Amino acid sequence: PGSGLAALAHELAFRHIVLNDPNIGGRYSALSHFGLLPAALTGVDLTDLLGRTSTAIQSMRPAVELGAFMGDGANQGRDKLTLLLSPPLAPVGAWIEQLIAESTGKEGQGILPIDMEPALEAADYSGDRLFVYLRMDDTLDERVASLVSAGQPLLQISLDELHDLGTAFYYWEFATALAGHLMGIHPFDQPDVEAAKVLARDM
């Protein structure tokens, strides 16, 4: 609301004008108009996606467990988070990476998310790692089992199908905010990002 694009849309009588809440940070906007409108235009059944999300989040335990896993782990020196994603979910890794890095990477600390890392032997990882397995098929089960057997800290979140991504988005957003709180970090501001935008505009 109030942007030049919104003014232009009204001036030219666009067929539909969708205004998003300006208080929602971009990285937390997957379930806002910013994320849902493009999804609808590509054929995603939003009724199914949001219905499944609404049902699943009646229990926030998985999100709380994920947030505590990340926040407590970081406080204990395990501040590298390796993402293990079933192949159909691989594109989600880039969003998770941005969400966690921008939300927690400030004040001289943070969680470093690692996406698309080549597989190492379970014993080759140092003691600063956490692993989260976002599972939708069994492709990575053997690798995950070897990590667990080696004593690596790993949390698994299982999805039945792609329309459960709404649930995953919600869980990750909540968990990231909780992790930031546990680390004593404000998870919603982005001082360095805003400073960079100001510098870019002044160039």
Segments from the language model and where they lie:
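Phosphate/diphosphate-binding loops
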Residues: L134-S158
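Active-site phosphate/pyrophosphate-binding segments
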Residues: P1-V132, D137, T167, Y171-M203
